[in-house]
């Protein structure tokens, strides 16, 4: 088992990475407050891992909530199902919420924990590659609104993140690829040696080699933990994690939540950001081709959906939560491993990107 730490002073917390961790009850006990535990999962993950999770919290008063699976259910109406169970069972302020699932479950459980009685303890047990390397770490929680992704939410850090890599054995190939988009993102924004390693080890990742997967997860989490420790509330440096996300969120919303997976939208969105970076004179065509090649090798889309118009992109991007004073701020690349955030780009180049890169 590997242990990393997200350094946030008194609110620092560990990330445990290894095989078979879900079966280690003693691992969880130091991070549970009170006697009541609410495990939130979904209809896909619960049949596979809920019983094992309940055993990990044996000795506590455990209740469960099983939500429908999919980004289209990440909304306030479905969120209320978590509150309903907590309130009906008189969960108090000492209770612990546990997220058992992918990014949607983690985001919703975290937001429920941030909101219930003005904030209760919660633990992340991410079961998809995307949630293991990205959404479970850093304390971002929330739900979608019909007019935008993650527009309603809060920063609420978990007590710990437990990454049992065995859960990836049951992950669908499409979900694995979606997670690889976020893994590749770390190489693109801050870690060129990791990008090179990914180019060499992508076959092992796709084959679910446990050693290769564990290293990719560890290096991704370390990159995220380092930046979150410096910029918890996304005042500056942490915004680099949004490479491809402004374009990608527009794709997810425009195509209807759940039709494009988050990682798929991010992949196509990263290529749009790469194209704009090239138009800005920052990124070489060689780098553009390398980035496209690794995403395609990971079975990810490198083009946005043709159904979306330029105006639809612009309208959805203008509603993004990262917009400041009406300015769409984007993460662009100077080179692989060197990202920067800017709103200082010619509007005609953004429009040209949306017209030409499709």
UniProtKB/Swiss-Prot annotation:
InterPro entries: Dehydroquinate_synthase, DHQ_synth_AroB, DHQ_synth_fam, DHQS/DOIS_N, DHQS_C
Cited SUPFAM superfamilies: Dehydroquinate synthase-like (SSF56796)
Gene3D superfamilies the UniProt entry points to: 3.40.50.1970, Dehydroquinate synthase-like - alpha domain
UniProt GO cellular component terms: cytoplasm
Note describing how the cofactor binds: Binds 1 divalent metal cation per subunit. Can use either Co(2+) or Zn(2+).
The keyword Plastid belongs to this UniProt entry's keyword annotation: no
Single Gene Ontology BP annotation: aromatic amino acid family biosynthetic process
HAMAP family according to UniProt: DHQ_synthase (MF_00110)
Function comment: Catalyzes the conversion of 3-deoxy-D-arabino-heptulosonate 7-phosphate (DAHP) to dehydroquinate (DHQ).
Name recorded for this polypeptide: 3-dehydroquinate synthase
Organism whose genome encodes this protein: Hydrogenovibrio crunogenus (strain DSM 25203 / XCL-2) (Thiomicrospira crunogena)
Gene name of the encoded protein: aroB
